[in-house]
């Protein structure tokens, strides 16, 4: 695999003013506040959905008007937003405990995020708002409670799927009614339930989603697997990963291969399932005909982009978000290198689209290659090839548009 740079495009901010918080609903998206946005998706009309993770909501930017609104979740207490009656919220005192212990038996723990120098995000308990894990199912999505949502996907009918990450569930907002329901996960941070109803199966920190007419795919990150929910039957199965956090198994059955914290999943037009195998620093693919897995990008090497003067490298550094364009190219957030890159399936080359390798904000209105990002997590691409980026630690959504 070789590397190159792409034809220059323009980078701009679409949503977020850079100040972490929750504000601006009903106004221009660029003037609104976001708080560590993670996943993104674009519907058939070009409207953008944002998993506004630290705000525990999903927001929508209207393609025509540029107005931002909240479509799922309850805004944080004290935040500036639309007046929506909320159920009582419980507070929890901070405790001394192992921040990485298994709390799956306690569904009312409060979580916050800590990040190490590499940008790895962890969830720890104590001291924040308690989020009721099952609050809102069967009612309006705007009154439901989410817990660090990390990914969103929209199907052909306009139904919205949400990776409700720290509730260990995937939820669905009906396009016609706005009602939210659970479609996968019991709320327990465990692994069980394959070949049975997805709502009776356990998933563990889902962080990526992709949906087709037939199935919903879930990056079941802490189970080191990719799961599939048949939309006709509701049955869940594993399509990749043996549960071991390791790298192994290319050119074998995907369910016999090892993944390490997969954070993203995407579908090609030919049915190929692409996986951001984050802690293996690779992009993997699963062939729909054979079920075999292969590595398509990344070599597992330790890599941090140092600038255009350095020798080109095919290595990735904890890729998180992934999307497939109508041209079959695979777009990815090379998160720890603060880059957006693209893999060309025809030429087998990997290219830099945006990012300088430095975690900062800059470059709006100019060459996308000179634009700075900070730990980008999510990426989406629309039918015209416009690329949307969750510039997570800059608390913005950036957009990359091609030049003539």
Describe each PLM feature range.
Residues 42-45, 154-157, 211-214, 267-270, ...:
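Residue-level detector of Asp-centered blade-edge/turn motifs that repeat once per structural unit
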Residues 56-60, 67, 168-172, 179, ...:
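A short loop-to-beta-strand structural motif that recurs across blades of beta-propeller domains
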Residues 47-49, 159-161, 216-218, 272-274, ...:
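Conserved beta-propeller blade signature
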Residues 3-36, 66-91, 103-148, 178-205, ...:
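Gly/Pro-rich loop segments of beta-rich domains
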């Amino acid at each position: 695999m070789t590397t190159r740079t792409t034809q220059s495009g323009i980078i701009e901010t679409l949503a977020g003013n850079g100040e972490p918080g929750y504000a601006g609903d009903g106004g221009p998206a660029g003037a609104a506040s976001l708080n560590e946005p993670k996943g993104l998706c674009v519907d058939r009309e070009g409207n953008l959905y944002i998993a506004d993770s630290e705000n525990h909501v999903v927001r929508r930017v209207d393609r025509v008007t540029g107005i931002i609104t909240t479509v799922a979740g309850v805004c944080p207490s004290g935040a500036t937003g639309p007046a929506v009656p909320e159920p009582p919220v419980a507070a929890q005192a901070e405790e001394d405990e192992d921040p990485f212990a298994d709390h799956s038996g306690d569904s009312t723990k409060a979580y916050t995020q800590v990040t190490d120098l590499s940008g790895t995000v962890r969830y720890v308990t104590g001291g924040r708002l308690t989020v009721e894990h099952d609050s809102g199912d069967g009612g309006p999505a705007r009154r439901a409670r989410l817990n660090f949502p990390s990914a969103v996907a929209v199907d052909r009918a306009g139904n919205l799927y949400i990776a409700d990450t720290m509730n260990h569930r995937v939820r669905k907002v009906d396009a016609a009614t706005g009602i939210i329901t659970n479609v996968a996960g019991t709320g327990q941070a465990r692994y069980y339930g394959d070949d049975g109803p997805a709502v009776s199966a356990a998933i563990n920190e889902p962080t990526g989603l992709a949906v087709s007419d037939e199935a919903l795919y879930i990056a079941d990150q802490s189970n080191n697997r990719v799961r599939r929910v048949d939309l006709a039957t509701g049955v869940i199965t594993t399509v990749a990963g043996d549960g071991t956090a390791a790298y192994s198994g290319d050119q074998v059955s995907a369910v016999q291969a090892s993944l390490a914290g997969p954070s993203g999943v995407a579908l090609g037009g030919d049915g190929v399932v692409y996986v951001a195998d984050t802690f293996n620093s690779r992009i993997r693919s699963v062939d729909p005909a054979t079920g075999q897995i292969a590595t398509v990008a990344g070599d597992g090497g330790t890599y941090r982009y140092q600038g255009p003067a350095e020798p080109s490298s095919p290595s990735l550094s904890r890729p998180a978000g992934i999307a497939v364009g109508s041209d079959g190219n695979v777009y990815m957030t090379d998160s720890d290198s603060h880059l957006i890159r693209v893999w060309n399936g025809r030429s087998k080359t990997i290219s830099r689209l945006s990012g300088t390798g430095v975690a900062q904000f800059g470059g709006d209105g100019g060459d996308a290659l000179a634009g700075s990002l900070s730990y980008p997590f999510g990426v989406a691409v629309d039918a015209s090839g416009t690329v949307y980026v969750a510039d997570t630690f800059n608390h913005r959504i950036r957009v990359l548009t091609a030049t003539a």
